[in-house]
Amino acid sequence: MKKFSILILAILATVTCGWANLGDGYEKLDDSYGNIVQRKLRDDGTVSVLYHKDRYLYQVTFADGRSVSESYFHVKGTDLSEKEITKLLKANAGGATWTSNQEAKKRSFKRSDGKAEATYGNVNGRSALTVREVLGKP
């Protein structure tokens, strides 16, 4: 019975950890975001990886093996729906909440813990939601 309980807990932990998000490492994002389309080492030492899964493209920037910025696009270049934006923000909430700032051409969001911000607008010619870590002041 004890082994069965441990097995159930392991399965539940795996199922609940199925979503990747800001701050996660290569392995979790590789598993969650699908096929790697492109990987580039950038001049600043970060690594940019483009993933493709289902109808989405995920552009992720890694620093020190952790995701510090993620952009979410539709493969066809169409706009993300409000429901999709809400779902992606929720996945990157880290236990905090998001507040929206409406601007003329670009929508922006701030996380209540001050550790992340997001914008919805044009990235490389496509509509995208970009979530990025906000670095603390030294």
Question: Where are each of the predicted segments found?
Answer:
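Bacterial N-terminal signal peptides
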Residues: 5-15
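Short, flexible active-site loop motifs that bind/organize anionic cofactors or intermediates
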Residues: 10, 19, 75
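Functionally constrained cores in energy, signaling, and assembly domains
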Residues: 14, 24, 33
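N-terminal compositionally biased, intrinsically disordered segments and leader/signal-like regions
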Residues: 15-17, 79
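Cleaved targeting-peptide boundary
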Residues: 19-28
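A cross-family detector of function-defining hotspots
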Residues: 28-130, 135-137
